[in-house]
């Protein structure tokens, strides 16, 4: 009986691990709702953008730093690919600075290799540098 239970648990664990994606599917209703809401308030050159996941979204950044003209672009559950997908509306405003909190959900909830995640992260940083070169980026 113990052997049967161990076999069933091992099989369930293997199936669960095999089903984890290499990258997260960030495109749920919540993501699109938050993205739409955020994009309705355009980024301006005097803004400091907080870009990230739920850790960013839940921060009261504008209250903490009122003189910095902070706008919060955090979306709970977001991943590097999701941030890259919404980067156009951010860099179009040529913000003064971007604080980036990215990769946490990728590492916790997907099986993406650290090297692949690093390449996604580098592409995100390269796009910011190319499309908004005067923007300071803080990681």
Language-model features, listed with the residues they occupy:
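N-terminal secretory targeting modules
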Residues: 1-51, 56, 61-62, 93
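Small-side-chain structural scaffolding
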Residues: 19, 56, 76, 95-97, ...
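Acidic-enriched, low-complexity/disordered segments with a strong bias for Aspartate over Glutamate
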Residues: 22-25, 29, 78, 88, ...
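Solvent-exposed, flexible loop/coil residues
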Residues: 35, 59, 69, 79, ...
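Solvent-exposed, acidic/flexible segments
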Residues: 48, 76, 80, 114-118
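Solvent-exposed loop/turn segments at secondary-structure junctions
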Residues: 54-58, 76-80, 104-109
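Alpha-helical cap/lid subdomain in secreted, periplasmic
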Residues: 63-64, 69, 84-139
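Hydrophobic residues at beta-strand termini and immediately following loops
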Residues: 73
